[in-house]
């Protein structure tokens, strides 16, 4: 029996050391050297070096002077990140969407873009399609007393064109540009 136990325990200890300690340390070291910003959470800092958020996680911006992110089923909390898991036939989902659409439609004119009414799969998607950002420009321009053309130019600057997929705008980056205009 001892002939079987000792090799099994040795192999278990070796594999635990390799896969539980050495491999994670090696991957972390390579990531810190090759991709330091991404390895540390893609943190976004303001002009004073203060962390304002992550480029990968949406935030709840309140008030008419800010561009708003998609709705979040988990209140923008990373611990509770998930979709609402409500089916399209669920009355609670229909009521939330109707309420959001009515609020957005009162503030603006025209049909509300779908991205401003639906949550993302994670509930934390920081990006919006350019059309959803453009829909909010008149509200933000009026609240901040800025020319619409200036906000359109900022939107163009903040629009990302990924290799695969449609263009998107990072709402945190766009709101940071607006905040810099105020200073």
Swiss-Prot record:
Keyword Ribonucleoprotein: no
Gene Ontology MF annotations: ATP binding; P-type potassium transmembrane transporter activity
Compartments it resides in: Cell inner membrane
Pfam families: KdpC
Gene Ontology CC terms: plasma membrane
Superkingdom of origin organism: Bacteria
InterPro entries per UniProt: KdpC
Membrane topology value: Single-pass membrane protein
Keywords, in A-Z order: ATP-binding, Cell inner membrane, Cell membrane, Ion transport, Membrane, Nucleotide-binding, Potassium, Potassium transport, Transmembrane, Transmembrane helix, Transport
Residue intervals passing through the bilayer: 11-31
Matching PANTHER family: POTASSIUM-TRANSPORTING ATPASE C CHAIN (PTHR30042), POTASSIUM-TRANSPORTING ATPASE KDPC SUBUNIT (PTHR30042:SF2)
Protein family according to the UniProt entry: Belongs to the KdpC family.
Job of this protein: Part of the high-affinity ATP-driven potassium transport (or Kdp) system, which catalyzes the hydrolysis of ATP coupled with the electrogenic transport of potassium into the cytoplasm. This subunit acts as a catalytic chaperone that increases the ATP-binding affinity of the ATP-hydrolyzing subunit KdpB by the formation of a transient KdpB/KdpC/ATP ternary complex.
Quaternary structure and partners: The system is composed of three essential subunits: KdpA, KdpB and KdpC.
HAMAP family to which the protein is assigned, alphabetical: KdpC
Name of protein: Potassium-transporting ATPase KdpC subunit
Organism: Pseudomonas putida (strain GB-1)
